[in-house]
A protein has these predicted regions:
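Active-site SXXK
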Residues: 32-46
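Peptidyl-prolyl cis-trans isomerase
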Residues: 53, 98-107, 157
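Non-catalytic, conformational "gating/processing" segments within enzyme and secreted inhibitor domains
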Residues: 110, 159, 163-195, 393
Length: 446
């Protein structure tokens, strides 16, 4: 396990973060959603932390915690008062070494994830946007499906399937531990050795090579969403992976086109011509590839095709003309400000360090990232726009309201059926105190 310590004693707070090099791209075939499932499942308890007690322990000790999954990684963290560092390290070592993975936990989290999918994807306006884009851009790869995966796949999965997935990816040699904030380095090192040292590093992970073919002709697609009333125009281009300098140039292009009211697309299409209710662009860099999205909501009598024509016109300008000095200085100021904000606290620095190690194999990238952005010249912006943002290299997705369905023919009145009421028991009774936790053993003084 790679360990990173970042000491900042200005505030009596410490963050313990463990990031694993497993994301939804690593989900097995016909078992989509496994990585995200484990984001939930590994809070179910351990051999020494009873089921349902994890969040209570953290809260009772003045802390907070969370976890998230992306296409490429999964991370867990606790933020505690600095005098609870040992507790945070012990809990994360428990998650790694002694997780309880059983049928009741799987069934419980399956229900939780079904509700999460309904809220964030299926019943949310434009909730299937990203999954529709990846389905067309990355067929046959781990990026083709949504992070949350298929409910059918999760329903069909067995306990053995989950155990095998855990055995493959959740081990020290696929993880990085970051401790950031107020702590004493020597003491932190002793605790890390005590709690993580005995854990077997695990076997090497055999990953299939990533193969994705370039787009040579515009892909035209349509998706109907019952949750929307206004159609959305979406243009998506396949772009280079996150470790490419060109991916950073594409970040700049996003800002030029749509970051703020004075950006090119926003000023032209929203303010001046009043063609769009909204227009946006962003670069989504992944470990093995990337995607660049431009999306907008047409206004009034304007159509999605009208928006596409205006977007193409602005991209042509980027491909043929250098940006102005004023735009260039605005970019520099924006990215310096963004970098400072993201890394202004030990908590933010911890995530940056863990992400840089997991995505790029180089935690020190945090010290060079801003300088790399500063070194990008207007000529590079023009060349990258020419290379990646062409009509024959993209998906044109028309994301539209669901077509009205014909009314069913009813020959006789349908019976009136009362909907049964189901009261969900309160899983977090405020009167119930957390059970006594077995304290971590104190390390012996040498």
């Amino acid at each position: 396990m790679h360990v990173i310590l970042y000491q900042d004693n200005s505030v009596p707070v410490v963050k313990v973060e463990v990031m694993y090099g497993v994301g939804s791209k690593d989900d097995p075939a016909r078992k989509t959603g496994f990585a995200h499932f484990f984001e939930h499942l590994l809070f179910e308890g351990t051999a020494n932390i009873e089921r349902g007690e994890w969040f209570k322990i953290v809260s009772a000790n003045g802390g907070r915690n969370n976890a998230y999954t992306t296409y490429d990684l999964t991370t867990y963290f606790e933020i505690f008062p600095s005098n609870q560092l040992e507790l945070g390290l012990w809990m994360e070592s428990e998650r790694l070494l002694h997780p309880v993975i059983n049928q009741i936990g799987v069934e419980t989290q399956n229900g939780v994830i079904k509700e999460e999918r309904r809220q964030t994807q299926d019943n949310r306006p434009y909730g299937n946007l990203i999954s529709e884009v990846t389905r067309h851009l990355f067929p046959g790869t781990g990026y083709y499906h949504s992070i949350i995966g298929s409910i059918e796949d999760l329903d069909n999965a067995t306990l053995e399937d989950f155990l095998n997935f855990h055995k493959t990816f959740y081990m020290p040699n696929n993880a990085v531990l970051v401790v950031a904030g107020d702590f004493k380095k020597d003491q932190a090192k002793r605790w890390i050795q005590q709690y993580f040292g005995p854990i077997p590093k695990g076997e090497s992970i055999m990953r299939a090579p990533f193969v994705s073919h370039p787009i040579t002709e515009q892909i035209n697609a349509k998706f109907e969403d019952a949750n929307i009333q206004t159609p959305m125009m979406v243009l998506a281009y396949k772009t280079p992976p996150a470790d490419s300098r060109e991916a950073m140039v594409l970040d700049f292009i996003s800002s030029i086109l749509s970051d703020g009211k004075s950006s090119r697309l926003s000023k032209k299409m929203v303010d001046d011509k009043k063609m769009a209710l909204f227009i946006g662009a962003f670069n989504y860099a992944l470990k093995n590839s990337g995607m660049y999205l431009i999306y907008g909501l047409p206004m009034g009598d304007f159509t999605m095709d009208d928006l596409v024509r205006e977007v193409d016109e602005e991209i042509k300008k980027l491909q043929n003309e250098l940006i102005t000095e004023r735009e260039y200085q605005k970019l520099m100021n924006q990215y310096e400000n963004n970098f400072v904000q993201s890394n202004s606290t030990p908590e933010g620095i911890a995530t940056s360090l863990a992400t840089n190690f997991t995505m790029f194999g180089n935690a020190n990238r945090i010290n060079t990232e801003l300088e790399t952005y500063r070194s990008i010249k207007p000529e590079e912006i023009r060349e990258v726009a020419r290379k990646y943002l062409n009509p024959n290299q993209r998906l044109y997705l028309q994301y539209v309201p669901e077509s009205p369905k014909p009314a069913p023919v009813v020959e006789e009145p349908a019976p009136v059926i009362e909907e049964p009421k189901v009261e969900t028991p309160n899983a977090m009774d405020p009167k119930k105190k957390p059970k006594k936790v077995k304290k971590p053993k104190k390390s012996k003084k040498k």
